[in-house]
Amino acid sequence: MTIIVTGAAGFIGSNLVKGLNARGENHIVAVDNLHRADKFHNLVDCEIRDYLDKDDFLSRFERGEFGRVRAVFHLGACTDTMEQDGRYLMENNYRYSKTLMELCLAQDTQFIYASSAAVYGESHSFREAREYERPLSVYGYSKFLFDQAVRNRLDGALSQVVGLRYFNVYGPGEAHKARMASIVCQQFEQFRAEGTVKLFGEHGGHGPGCQSHDFVSIDDVVKVNLFFLDHPRRSGIFNVGSGHARSFNDVACVVVNTLRAAEDKPPLALEELVQEGLLEYLRFPDALRGRYQSFTQSDSSRLREAGYTAPFVAMEEGVARYCQWLLERGQ
């Protein structure tokens, strides 16, 4: 049967298509918007049956043009957390998603979509419950509102509906995201270009570079998606993160020392990186004040209760592997 992936040329989407291909799934319809044409590079190594623009997809899916569809992985959305056009975000991230969910329910098709840890805002608890959801941006609100729509449909849903709340995902295939690429990718590119990594200084009770996020490897994200594909009776909203918050300082140490190792240079401790000017701290930008999550850490209890038992890749291992991958490709 056909599997449809929206946002297929994007970061998570293209990696998911590769993960499906690795299992022998090639009857895949890729849906995206190639307004950013350079995203096509992510699809070059993918085996797909067809490609559609997102604006053409919904009507054709509603008409049943793809026959029996096993699952729709909905990863297409505006992922720019700094986007200020609320109408655009609500149309793309909320209304489009809501229409697609209803079509999947009507056709008895598994629906697995991308939510975001942005729904939690500055909450100090990251559990999938309404009382902990306090988005700081209109992007986070668009994701939050669709999650509420999903909750309102779950009780009567006869087919699978799964929302996956991604924390800070990193890995191959994200370079096109520019300022929305992971901290790992940004630090790698900055150090290669300038010989230093620049982090946020003190802000909101967090010391220089001590802002901490839950960094999760794209490999783990793909595995979680495939788990729910294989377990169509599981529905709900689930966090997808390592369960461990790591500081930007921690990540920078791994990035810089991986690059130093490639030049046969010894690793340096955080204090040494700062002393040698390889790590600098900048004033926290005014544009992010009141809109930035200084701390995130996934509560994976619900995911584990659903039966997902695989361990998550440790930050040190995953970041070093990703940096080596970038080096091998001359990036």
Swiss-Prot record:
<dbReference type="InterPro" id="IPR011912">
    <property type="entry name" value="Heptose_epim"/>
</dbReference>
<feature type="binding site">
    <location>
        <position position="292"/>
    </location>
    <ligand>
        <name>substrate</name>
    </ligand>
</feature>
<feature type="binding site">
    <location>
        <position position="39"/>
    </location>
    <ligand>
        <name>NADP(+)</name>
    </ligand>
</feature>
<feature type="binding site">
    <location>
        <position position="186"/>
    </location>
    <ligand>
        <name>substrate</name>
    </ligand>
</feature>
<feature type="binding site">
    <location>
        <position position="143"/>
    </location>
    <ligand>
        <name>NADP(+)</name>
    </ligand>
</feature>
<feature type="binding site">
    <location>
        <begin position="200"/>
        <end position="203"/>
    </location>
    <ligand>
        <name>substrate</name>
    </ligand>
</feature>
<feature type="binding site">
    <location>
        <position position="168"/>
    </location>
    <ligand>
        <name>substrate</name>
    </ligand>
</feature>
<feature type="binding site">
    <location>
        <begin position="75"/>
        <end position="79"/>
    </location>
    <ligand>
        <name>NADP(+)</name>
    </ligand>
</feature>
<comment type="subunit">
    <text>Homopentamer.</text>
</comment>
<comment type="pathway">
    <text>Nucleotide-sugar biosynthesis; ADP-L-glycero-beta-D-manno-heptose biosynthesis; ADP-L-glycero-beta-D-manno-heptose from D-glycero-beta-D-manno-heptose 7-phosphate: step 4/4.</text>
</comment>
<comment type="similarity">
    <text>Belongs to the NAD(P)-dependent epimerase/dehydratase family. HldD subfamily.</text>
</comment>
<feature type="binding site">
    <location>
        <begin position="32"/>
        <end position="33"/>
    </location>
    <ligand>
        <name>NADP(+)</name>
    </ligand>
</feature>
<protein>
    <recommendedName>
        <fullName>ADP-L-glycero-D-manno-heptose-6-epimerase</fullName>
        <ecNumber>5.1.3.20</ecNumber>
    </recommendedName>
</protein>
<comment type="function">
    <text>Catalyzes the interconversion between ADP-D-glycero-beta-D-manno-heptose and ADP-L-glycero-beta-D-manno-heptose via an epimerization at carbon 6 of the heptose.</text>
</comment>
<keyword id="KW-0521">NADP</keyword>
<dbReference type="GO" id="GO:0005975">
    <property type="term" value="P:carbohydrate metabolic process"/>
</dbReference>
<dbReference type="Pfam" id="PF01370">
    <property type="entry name" value="Epimerase"/>
</dbReference>
<feature type="binding site">
    <location>
        <position position="213"/>
    </location>
    <ligand>
        <name>substrate</name>
    </ligand>
</feature>
<feature type="binding site">
    <location>
        <position position="179"/>
    </location>
    <ligand>
        <name>substrate</name>
    </ligand>
</feature>
<feature type="active site" description="Proton acceptor">
    <location>
        <position position="177"/>
    </location>
</feature>
<dbReference type="InterPro" id="IPR001509">
    <property type="entry name" value="Epimerase_deHydtase"/>
</dbReference>
<feature type="active site" description="Proton acceptor">
    <location>
        <position position="139"/>
    </location>
</feature>
<feature type="binding site">
    <location>
        <position position="177"/>
    </location>
    <ligand>
        <name>NADP(+)</name>
    </ligand>
</feature>
<feature type="binding site">
    <location>
        <position position="169"/>
    </location>
    <ligand>
        <name>NADP(+)</name>
    </ligand>
</feature>
<feature type="binding site">
    <location>
        <position position="54"/>
    </location>
    <ligand>
        <name>NADP(+)</name>
    </ligand>
</feature>
<keyword id="KW-0119">Carbohydrate metabolism</keyword>
<keyword id="KW-0413">Isomerase</keyword>
<feature type="binding site">
    <location>
        <position position="92"/>
    </location>
    <ligand>
        <name>NADP(+)</name>
    </ligand>
</feature>
<dbReference type="InterPro" id="IPR036291">
    <property type="entry name" value="NAD(P)-bd_dom_sf"/>
</dbReference>
<dbReference type="GO" id="GO:0008712">
    <property type="term" value="F:ADP-glyceromanno-heptose 6-epimerase activity"/>
</dbReference>
<dbReference type="GO" id="GO:0097171">
    <property type="term" value="P:ADP-L-glycero-beta-D-manno-heptose biosynthetic process"/>
</dbReference>
<dbReference type="GO" id="GO:0050661">
    <property type="term" value="F:NADP binding"/>
</dbReference>
<feature type="binding site">
    <location>
        <begin position="11"/>
        <end position="12"/>
    </location>
    <ligand>
        <name>NADP(+)</name>
    </ligand>
</feature>
